[in-house]
Amino acid sequence: MANPFRAEVKQLYKALLFLGREYPKGADYFRERLRAAFAKNKDMRDPDKIKQLISRGEFVVKELEALYYLRKYRALKKRYYEAE
């Protein structure tokens, strides 16, 4: 029987992998950590726990997006405004 969360987990993995390209410590570092995190939970069968892990992954996606937006904002502010 196929796991009903398979597509959602794959989408989350792809989204995180895409966001990891601009990670401050480097894409290779991020990719290794991401792969290890997903491999650690590969045998999970409890639907409630899987939902919880997916929610946590979506939270990480939002945090990474916020990190990147903040970094871009700081770079623009640094270029166009004088130091206070």
From Swiss-Prot:
Example GO BP: negative regulation of oxidative phosphorylation
For this record, an example GO cellular component is: mitochondrion
What the entry lists under InterPro entries is as follows: Complex1_LYR_dom, Complex1_LYR_ETFRF1_LYRM5, ETFRF1
Pfam families annotated for this entry?
A: Complex1_LYR
Entry similarity comment: Belongs to the complex I LYR family.
Per its UniProt record, what PANTHER family does this chain match?
Answer: ELECTRON TRANSFER FLAVOPROTEIN REGULATORY FACTOR 1 (PTHR21024:SF0), GROWTH HORMONE-INDUCIBLE SOLUBLE PROTEIN-RELATED (PTHR21024)
The protein here is known as LYR motif-containing protein 5B
* Species: Danio rerio (Zebrafish)
